[in-house]
Amino acid sequence: MEEGSSSPVSPVDSLGTSEEELERQPKRFGRKRRYSKKSSEDGSPTPGKRGKKGSPSAQSFEELQSQRILANVRERQRTQSLNEAFAALRKIIPTLPSDKLSKIQTLKLAARYIDFLYQVLQSDEMDNKMTSCSYVAHERLSYAFSVWRMEGAWSMSASH
């Protein structure tokens, strides 16, 4: 327990910190993470370093702008990848024609569909002929899942 309080992250022991210092620490650590390249050049984020950020040179402004552009590109790619994954998931899950599923609804329905398929595999209700034709098997499962949903085994809430 003593070793955790004297970690390298907080150089001052918890006994020697005032409330004011504790309030400043999260802000300082937040800035250090945000400007990790800048603060790691000289080893520590100092108040003098903040003064230089107030009047950035043309090079640092361009550098920050290019970093922001790259971050935006990465975020767009991540969002596009996520949307493509949800589109693929929506194609797999049997839905009703009236369904306009949000992402959370899609995930919840997918989880319920997996549970439904597991129950189907565990039961002897389906005969072995279904495995001979995957298209027919998929259509039967889709129909059975739709009936299962309509019977109220799983109701979709509009608030989710």
From Swiss-Prot:
Biased amino acid composition, Basic residues: 27-37
**Disordered, as annotated region:** 1-63
One term of GO molecular function: DNA-binding transcription factor activity
Enumerate the spans annotated as bHLH domain: 66-117
- Which SMART domains does this UniProt record tie to the protein? HLH (SM00353)
Q: How does it assemble?
A: Efficient DNA binding requires dimerization with another bHLH protein. Forms a heterodimer with TCF3/E12. Also interacts with MEF2C.
The name under which this protein is listed is Twist-related protein 2
Source organism lineage?
Answer: Eukaryota, Metazoa, Chordata, Craniata, Vertebrata
The protein's gene is named Twist2
